[in-house]
Amino acid sequence: TMEHYLKTYLSWLTEEQKEKLKEMKEAGKTKAEIQHEVMHYYDQLHGEEKQQATEKLKVGCKMLLKGIIGEEKVVELRNMKEAGADIQELQQKVEKMLSEVTDEKQKEKVHEYGPACKKIFGATTLQHHRRRRHHFTLESSLDTHLKWLSQEQKDELLKMKKDGKTKKELEAKILHYYDELEGDAKKEATEHLKGGCGEILKHVVGEEKAAELKNLKDSGASKEELKAKVEEALHAVTDEEKKQYIADFGPACKKIYGVHTSRRRRHHFTLESSLDTHLKWLSQEQKDELLKMKKDGKAKKELEAKILHYYDELEGDAKKEATEHLKGGCAEILKHVVGEEKAAELKNLKDSGASKEELKAKVEEALHAVTDEEKKQYIADFGPACKKIYGVHTSRRRRHHFTLESSLDTHLKWLSQEQKDELLKMKKDGKTKKDLQAKILHYYDELEGDAKKEATEHLKDGCREILKHVVGEEKEAELKKLKDSGASKEEVKAKVEEALHAVTDEEKKQYIADFGPACKKIFGAAHTSRRRRHHFTLESSLDTHLKWLSQEQKDELLKMKKDGKAKKELEAKILHYYDELEGDAKKEATEHLKGGCREILKHVVGEEKAAELKNLKDSGASKEELKAKVEEALHAVTDEEKKQYIADFGPACKKIYGVHTSRRRRHHFTLESSLDTHLKWLSQEQKDELLKMKKDGKAKKELEAKILHYYDELEGDAKKEATEHLKGGCREILKHVVGEEKAAELKNLKDSGASKEELKAKVEEALHAVTDEEKKQYIADFGPACKKIYGVHTSRRRRHHFTLESSLDTHLKWLSQEQKDELLKMKKDGKAKKELEAKILHYYDELEGDAKKEATEHLKGGCREILKHVVGEEKAAELKNLKDSGASKEELKAKVEEALHAVTDEEKKQYIADFGPACKKIYGVHTSRRRRHHFTLESSLDTHLKWLSQEQKDELLKMKKDGKAKKELEAKILHYYDELEGDAKKEATEHLKGGCREILKHVVGEEKAAELKNLKDSGASKEELKAKVEEALHAVTDEEKKQYIADFGPACKKIYGVHTSRRRRHHFTLESSLDTHLKWLSQEQKDELLKMKKDGKAKKELEAKILHYYDELEGDAKKEATEHLKGGCREILKHVVGEEKAAELKNLKDSGASKEELKAKVEEALHAVTDEEKKQYIADFGPACKKIYGVHTSRRRRHHFTLESSLDTHLKWLSQEQKDELLKMKKDGKAKKELEAKILHYYDELEGDAKKEATEHLKGGCREILKHVVGEEKAAELKNLKDSGASKEELKAKVEEALHAVTDEEKKQYIADFGPACKKIYGVHTSRRRRYHAEDGTDDIDGLAQSRQRRSGFFEKLIDVFAFF
């Protein structure tokens, strides 16, 4: 449909363009006209928009091709492509396959869409040639072979190019200017254009061949000889770029070289000359309009269309006169094309009384034999119109009895006068035959009773008349006789189809296509089918199986039917009313609806089979047996009408029959019943909130989460009471699921004193043995919560001495009351344990002096208590003895780690994870503070930071007081340092170097430091000295000193490297770059960057801002910026790897090495760099340069996975508001992860059909990505594996294997980006299908058997998860 195309292959159109196409369709415009308009819009595009549209249209063309030639041949083409076939081989193969198509409808599609698809597939191949064609650009041509143009015309062409007009449009405009010339101006322009064509020919065939052709011309060779040699030379060209030149410039050059002769020969076919001959029947006003159109540069096709429009408006004698004149023109053109001798031969054949078919065959044969290109163009230009003119008179005479006008007095006489007038107006307004037919059927469908019967008879008469015309009177009489003999409807229908299938005449086949569907409908609406169906109409049903509806609801349904709402919408409304019922009203409605379903079943399978099914049910057969028999009976139905009943009513009846049983079985676990049993501990307000959530359609998961939230808020006796109630509910569910006998067995095991592990294993075994789908759903729904409830009491009893409340009086007693209150409030507000711990450590870090010491002792006491609990008292005592014996810190630490590593109890391992990091910090703080005091901020302000201003010192002290991290303080100091210049900078550098030397001495020892100093004083090179320092630092094993290296090393390296590197790096500063590889920035952007640098913004922020400006560019501006940035990257590469290596890489690139080879060599060269400064360059500039060098290719490859394109494909299920929000997030620079999270959030909010639809769209996107990542062949292999019935595990393993084999970095990034979300999407459908009967009271009949097979693996995984917890 048009809507489908606009959302998929034409989604790149603007809303205005889409509306225009819809209007064209509604106005009855032909498919060709609409396609012409689409290609017009496409031709206006350029750059990325063009690429995006091309990709969309290519997908459409591929789908079309698959539909025409079949999947098997598409796979054959794909295999050819992957085997390395070039575009010519593929094109030839496609042409061959299309030429073998025999189906008329498919051949019509080839004719309709082939040219456009060829154009689309040719569009992208032009891109990479644009750089090499610079000597044939518009700009250079204006001073050479286009110099004859006026300045005004040149300016117009340049403006057109700037506005993104296509090459075709520019060429058309140039030829338009050329066609307007006369006399000497024309001669001059012709010479210049011929010169341009000669230059292009020389470039395409080579100078030697061009010289050979020139010599041939100068020797006096005939035009035909010369033309043949040129064609031969062009045909021998194999270079793709040059072949494109031939395609681009060939037609225009042929025109230029042929213009003088052809103008003399063609003058009698110009518009002007024709107005006095075969167009003399036009009015003066119409002639003036045509001349104006030609003057305005309208195409020949548009002029022809206008003439035929004027012709179609004529009637009677005026029409006859025009037909004769036009036939005369066609005869004249035919004589010119095939020659006078052949034309005379055809005329004699016509005069001899030859049939239309014979004559047509001979004309086609004569035209097919024409080889002259100019004459072949005549055939292309005038052939279609002449065929129409020659066909119009006969067909009008033959078809008049099927025109709208004649039909209004025969088989449409039942229409009212108003309806007849409306149809005539529609025809006058140019509405299509389809529109008129649809309107007639609409009027017919509105009829009832006798009026309907009368109309049916009239329409049947019309259909019989058409049938007689199509199959012939003899065959029609034979069919009538068969019908009268009492043959069944199926026999008659088969014979009619056979007769229609045997028709070969194209005009008659068109009748079948035009009237067949409507006649089938009319013959199907007969008395029999109406009599059979009347008891299933809405009206009759309102008094039978829909009598439970209120009068208001009945009226609403009747109104919907009157308004033309679809059957599906009516059914949905009825089920909506049904779903709103409760209690007895629900029971009553269920019985009535079941009665209706039984009545339909009886009609569909027959009374005998229905009785058999009833007996089976009454005999006590299981639901599964009964269901299998019903499915078998329905599957055996062959009557199309009855099969339609199954499709129409089957889903609803399945739902109705599933609802009662599931409600009866589950009532004791409903929310309502639970509020008085295992949820009786909730407050009334909480119960009301839950009931409201259920009423508002909240999911079961949301209700469960809310209950657990209320539970988690409880404390003390209230918590105990709730725990007992919930445990009671869990026991009740367990009993229902595993059976009373097994539940009693488990209870006895528990009472006998079995361990928690034994009991858990037995429960898991019992649950694993459950096979009933409903009960397995209970396990999935209630299992996690019940495990939580049963685990909570023990863990709370064991952990109570580590709760926040108890700790406030022991190892957290050093906190102020205000701080304690804040922590209790955070816990009450549901803050995570990590947040509470972070807050405590924040309070601790703020302490100083004795307060700090006191807190440290208390916290250490808490850590010792936890350690004792985790490793046991015996091991804790052993560790204490080791400490007291004077063991070193390293020995003690190793023993503690060993003891912790030996812990196997999961709860205790959780303690290690929860409290370990904080305790390590507490135990490390006291010693390190004592040893590090001479490197504190306070002491440093008077030594190596004395160069700071007082204001800066105060700022640093304030930051420390506010709890800022050491990294932030260091960054601030380096910021102040970077702002300095001149002597101030030198002074600060010396002070900081002094600090670094002091730290180095502390870390490596005085002896090693003195050794390094001597090495430096001896004149050792920077590299030698650096190597020795690295060696000394590497030899450090003390953890505290290694921390010093980590903390101060980077800054000291910077300070020591700053003077030299500043001298060496000046050519890569922001300031110098603004005049080189950043010169493409606007002055405003440059000023902004300088301001950012002045404000102390980091290099990363400046780089991000530059890339932001770059990403905003488009077209030529983007190209220019890319070139400048690439130049900067090349300069940096040369500096990093050296000029020799850079030259080697450039030679490799120029030799035509692949992108992969070049990339590998660059990576190898960078990997070999050992100089730290240069390695820093790689770290600083590498990512951006990779982006710049990768931007064109990756943008072209990835555009089909952009947010914008996805909104019309696999994200089309989002609301407009949601789409706008995502686009805004992208515009605001939100990360891909954030966008993905938002999309999944929207997805998670969906339910029912909306969820299913979204899942299918997202799965489609995932399949598209998978195909891109692993390749079409591998994707097809995976699809075949899935279709063969492979298990989920097998399929998953194969997908993982395929993904693991991917080595391309870009594709691996796709896996990283989209893999997690796609795994989630593919997981959601199965789980929803498994739970379907537990959520809305129906059984997933179709998936029942498959889900049993899958669940065994699922529960194994589920048990593994439970075992982990």
From Swiss-Prot:
GO terms for molecular function: retinol binding. The keyword Transcription does not apply. Pfam families: NPA. Pseudocoelomic fluid. Keywords: Allergen, Cleavage on pair of basic residues, Lipid-binding, Repeat, Retinol-binding. InterPro entries: ABA-1_nematode, DVA-1_sf. Nematode polyprotein allergens (NPAs) are synthesized as large polypeptides that are subsequently proteolytically cleaved to active polypeptide units. The keyword Protein transport does not apply. Belongs to the NPA family. Has high binding affinity for fatty acids and retinoids. This is Polyprotein ABA-1. It comes from Ascaris suum (Pig roundworm).
